[in-house]
Amino acid sequence: MLNKCSGSLTLLAVRRFCGPCRRLHYHKDNPNNINIAKNLLNNNIQARCSTNEASWKLAQKELDLKIREYEQKLKDVKLNDINKKSPLNIPDEVWTKFISEVNSYDKEKENHLSTGNHELRRTTPLKIGPLLLTRIGLLKSKNTASNNYSVDHIVSNLANDNTLLNRQVSTEEWNSHLRHLLNIPKCFLGVDIVEIVNFFNYLPQTVISKSSLEIWKAVEESGMKVMPDLLVLLMESTNASGDFRKTVQLYHLYQKSNAPPNGLVYQSYAIALSSLGKHKDLVALYSEQKSVSITPSKDFLNACIKAFSRTKEFTKAWEVFNFMKFTATSISPSAETYGLMIQICSSQYNPEKALDLYNEMKLRPIDPLTPTTFVINNLIHALATDVRFQTVAFSLLQDLSHYGLRPNHSTLYELIRLIAYSGKLDYMKDILDNFWVRQKLLPSILKVEQIFHFIFRALISAEVQTSSVTPDYTHFKEEVRKIIDSSKEPLIPFLKRSTLTENDLFLNAIYTFEYAKRKFPEALNSRLVTDFLNIFLERGSVQLFKEIYQLEFREMSTMEGSSMKVAKITLTYIYAIKLALLFNDFEFGYAAWQEYWHCKIHKLLPKEDASYEQKVVLLTLSLLSKNKHTSLARSLLLSHLDKGWTWNKHSLGFMRKMCSVMNDQATVYLIDSITNEIGINQRFTRK
């Protein structure tokens, strides 16, 4: 009975993406899930067979509700399975294999770059006539104008070991022969277009790319129409050589020739637009392609999905994906398609959907797909920031080995990011030791400031034992100085000792910060300083935060430099006021506000991003309101209404709540007017 599920139930199942029947297949190894699916289908068999329209609609509603309940149960089961897994841990053999494979990948890449890319001619046979052979310079004959050579004569002329066709030919030689051809006026006159396509199919793509526009011009001058096959060959060659601007030029020339649209031409053009970052043009091309009766190719649709992802048009990307799954008859989503959609899930902060897509591509009943390194890298990225899925993200390293995939530099980047957000300090130290201290691989993948950002992020996320007594900042700095001065080896960006307690963590953070100041002072931008301060803010170490703010921040604020160092000051003020708000330290927060305002009034700060200033003002409004200084908060709010900022109930909600508690009806009315009425800013601007 389960195998005969049909009719409207099937349509509903498709609308729910494969419905209970396919979910039954996906979860066939889980007894709990399969029982749920069987019960769901059996309970609705009778309802499906109803002939009364009213009862049929009611049955559909019931089925829809049960499907939603079923999906929720599947979701709960999945989350329970995730939570039951072992703590974040990578088996030693998997970790060792990962380190060695990344090292071997890097060495192979270096060897490839050092040997160069000597592209040889293609292995396809050269099937062209003697006239074109003569003009190319491959066939020597007194009667160069004749095209009546016998096949045996051509073969005997080409059989000599010294001829171009019977030995490996350098790119320079092919370029020379192609220039010889293109220098002849109307060089393709009298030559069949099929022979021309065969000839260019034989040449290396770099040679074709270099002269692609001249080839187009020569074909037109010879009085021939450019066939789509030849255009696609030219565009594929320019794309393969990375000369995407020539691909765009070729497409525009093709448009001017009033030639009919071609799916492969669209595909090559889409790849070029995607590579050039012209995502808006690619979105327009997608609309143009839909208006013509041409079935799009898989590569074209993948390029469109990538464009919609870059332009943040995620709804359209899902439409293309669903078209490939449900509507298109000759194409279906590839592993690359799933990788791109997982990337979109990451942008939409939906790790659960990303994991569903990964399972779907592996378990779909028809043509299941094998994951690629690209897919797994994107899935690690999507899962890394959500604590619920970090165990699953680490287990993906085993999937790489299971499917015979090799990690690459992107895998290393995603793993460092995952380690940072999961707080696995031992793994972070191991990676830094292998790929930064022993060999300088990391700086070629990440900027130095990104590496420090991930180190600080790992220190924020790490789980350690709380220390009963925390020494002051001076004590930590003195200990760090002793470690640095007594070290006989070159400095490394982390302490090798284990980090078991909060004091160990603080010592490691201060050591890394001192290392960055000494070795990479140019990397200490606004993000890193706030990351460093955020370690103590997140740990609730108010006293250490204050000491670092007073000593390190003041020290940096006197440094001469660019607006980046000014942004550093502004962001640090934000963190100082935020700490005062969280830990009820009004004096510290108000002093930080006054210092910021002093620098701003006396123009000690260059013009900065408006969002920074608004953030400082909003935090100060909350700080004043929380400490019952509502009149000061109202004055501060009124003085900034002419800034053109967006005010809403969320940003002013805390201030309104505190003013309501204080029975300050004037300020409550002011906030309600600002957040509810259009043009209210004109009423409350300064005279």
From Swiss-Prot:
GO terms for cellular component: mitochondrial matrix; mitochondrion. One of its GO terms (biological process) is RNA splicing. Gene3D superfamilies: Tetratricopeptide repeat domain. Keywords: Mitochondrion, mRNA processing, mRNA splicing, Repeat, Transit peptide. Residues 1-49 form a transit peptide. Its main location: mitochondrion. The keyword Transit peptide applies. InterPro entries: Pentatricopeptide_rpt, TPR-like_helical_dom_sf. Binds to mitochondrial small subunit 15S rRNA. Belongs to the CCM1 family. Involved in mitochondrial-nuclear incompatibility, a major determinant in reproductive isolation between species, through hybrid incompatibility of Ccm1 and its interacting partner 15S rRNA between yeast species. Regulates mitochondrial small subunit maturation by controlling 15S rRNA 5'-end processing. Localizes to the 5' precursor of the 15S rRNA in a position that is subsequently occupied by mS47 in the mature yeast mtSSU. Uses structure and sequence-specific RNA recognition, binding to a single-stranded region of the precursor and specifically recognizing bases -6 to -1. The exchange of Ccm1 for mS47 is coupled to the irreversible removal of precursor rRNA that is accompanied by conformational changes of the mitoribosomal proteins uS5m and mS26. This is Mitochondrial 15S rRNA processing factor ppr3. It comes from Schizosaccharomyces pombe (strain 972 / ATCC 24843). The gene is ppr3.
